[in-house]
Amino acid sequence: QALVATISAFILKGVIPAEPAVAAKSGGRSLKEIVRQPGFLKTVFSGAVAYMVMNFLMTAAPLSMHMHGISQQASNLGIQWHVIAMYGPGFFTGRLINRFGALRISATGLLITAGSVLAGLCGTDIFHYWLSLILLGVGWNFGFTGASAKIIDYHRPEEKTQVQSLNDFVVFGVMIVGSFSSGALLNLYGWNAVLWGSLIPVGIAFLCILKRSHKTVVVKHE
């Protein structure tokens, strides 16, 4: 914990938050019109899935480790590496998005998340949990950041507030559902059921991205 705190303090040293820009209060399309754009809902859905599955598995993993006789210390360390994996790639995720595109990075994140599930299905040793959690963190970073970056293509500056508010509402609403349901599913059916259950939304979200990968929707910022 001390090492993580020290690294965080070093990174944030001297960082001064910029003054928030004042969004335009006039003009812009209705939220209904924005939502009806081809691909918008699929983009929101893929971002919500990336966040929900991350929280779903992260919540259940420590409980499952305890159920399989793994120490609390090992469980805590696994979560710490998971958090590092979540935010560590943030130093270069933006560059990857600029180079390869938001959709590709989001799809890559979902594939890494699927890899996290497969790692968990391989066994219940410490290594399996840690590998699963680390992959889960990286998958979340790519999947959620890519989807969030793609959302920008669907709104103009004066529409930013309402679009981001809707996106956040959906993402965090779904995340809460996943967080509360993971413990119950783990208790009733076990760790493997939690893992298999995670693959379904990940697969659907990945297919949604594949269908959008050959189309580009760009809003002209007039």
Model-derived segments and their meaning:
Residues T59-G78:
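Short amphipathic helix-loop junctions that connect adjacent transmembrane helices
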Residues E159-L188:
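A late C-terminal transmembrane helix in Major Facilitator Superfamily
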Residues P89-A102, L186:
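Helix-to-loop junctions at the C-terminal end of transmembrane segments
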Residues F142-R156:
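Intracellular juxtamembrane helix-capping segments at the cytosolic ends
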Residues Q1-P20, C208-S213:
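C-terminal membrane-cytosol helix-exit motif in multi-pass small-molecule transporters
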Residues G14-V44:
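Juxtamembrane intracellular "pre-TM" segments in multi-pass secondary transporters
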Residues R104-A119, L199:
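Structural signature of the two symmetry-related core transmembrane helices
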Residues R36-L57, I134:
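Pair of pore-lining "gating" transmembrane helices in MFS-fold secondary transporters
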